[in-house]
Amino acid sequence: MSTSVTLNLHLISDSTCETVASVARSALEHFRSVEVNEFVWSFINNNEQIDKIMSLIEKDKYNFIMYTMFDDELRRYLKQKAGAQEIPCIPVLSHVIREISCYLHIKKDPYISTNIGLDDEYFTRIDAINYTIAHDDGQNLWDIDQADIIILGVSRTSKSPTSIYLAYRGYRVVNIPLVHSINLSVDLSNMKNKLIVGLTIDIDRLIEIRRTRLVSMKNQNNYQYVDYEHVLMEIKETKRICVQNGWPIIDVTQKSVEEIAATIIQYFNKMQH
């Protein structure tokens, strides 16, 4: 597959889509060169909703469906419709459920309420997700004091996916891009009770990721974005700012989003004690 391919990933669930989204993002960590358009379809519980989804899928694109559904009839209907359009349709939990069932020699429960998790914790997560999306890439910093975590880093260091992953865990996150020779647009010196984390990465890996990004955007003429000396200055500036302010730095070179987030959560928990 060409590195410039864009995948339309459709996440479908009869519940909140949190499980299928988590599995999908873990899997996609192994394909960082692929540009992904993510479509989330939650609380799907009848054939008409599936028909609507299938009608909205662009036929001339690379499409991929991942889903969690506990109703056997609905699951079969989705697979039938996806098969008719020759779209891969992968159940993310079926194999695990089947293995547990076989091992224990019992059948799975025929029905699971889709209201599971719709409690205060669920709505806290929704609030965190909304806040984090609104504050992606340095946007809307006027209420940055409402954040739990602030992430800094140069372009393409996994700031946004890490922020969203943390939001799914209930943390309100702001991520701010660091651009060489441009001062931060907000004063973070008075954020003493906030966890501020810097993300860094191996320069060769960063340039590779950026080159792939430029190819996918058909913007190969942006030479400065992948110029070794310029990128090196960006990375050094990030480290300088973080060291100067006593903020922890995480090297994301060999880390998945889950690993980055887990490290950030550890720092956050230490601050609370």
UniProtKB/Swiss-Prot annotation:
Annotated keywords: Kinase, Nucleotide-binding, Serine/threonine-protein kinase, Transferase
Function comment: Bifunctional serine/threonine kinase and phosphorylase involved in the regulation of the pyruvate, phosphate dikinase (PPDK) by catalyzing its phosphorylation/dephosphorylation.
Name the record gives this protein: Putative pyruvate, phosphate dikinase regulatory protein
Pfam families the record matches: Kinase-PPPase
Originating organism: Ehrlichia chaffeensis (strain ATCC CRL-10679 / Arkansas)
PANTHER family: PYRUVATE, PHOSPHATE DIKINASE REGULATORY PROTEIN 1, CHLOROPLASTIC
Lineage of the organism: Bacteria, Pseudomonadati, Pseudomonadota, Alphaproteobacteria, Rickettsiales
Protein family membership: Belongs to the pyruvate, phosphate/water dikinase regulatory protein family. PDRP subfamily.
EC number from the UniProt entry: 2.7.11.32, 2.7.4.27
